[in-house]
Amino acid sequence: GGYYGYPYGVVGAVHDTPEVAAAKAAHFAAVAAAGGAAAVPLYGGAYVGAHDDGQYHPGLYGDEGQYHSHYDGGYVGYAGGYDDGQYRPGLYGDEGQYHGEGYAGHYAGPIAGVPVIVNGVPADTPAVAAAKAAHFAAHAHAAHY
């Protein structure tokens, strides 16, 4: 025991308030009810209605199933599709310079969390602390202190 019956030095589980417990129950009931709903496709539906019938269909990708290397003349790219070993400034729009973009600083301060007291027990909110003070004052008044 402890002062006014408050357990001292006991680390116990934190329980939900009745309001939080009711909100959790309503949330899980809604999740369970939504579980029976029709599933929605997770992609944009680019292939809606198309299926694989197991047959070969030529020209599906415009290449008739043939392999084309990058050097067969069909490739249209920079300098005819091959590297001739020459430097060309501005190929990527940065003139080959490193500017340090993409590495924004990150927050390295303390992690925001629940204020705690001894042994990691969560501290009371101001409203709870005021209610406890009023409660203990009422007990003291009833005991004629």
From Swiss-Prot:
It comes from the Eukaryota. One of its GO terms (molecular function) is structural constituent of cuticle. Keywords: Cuticle, Repeat. This is Cuticle protein 5. It comes from Blaberus craniifer (Death's head cockroach).
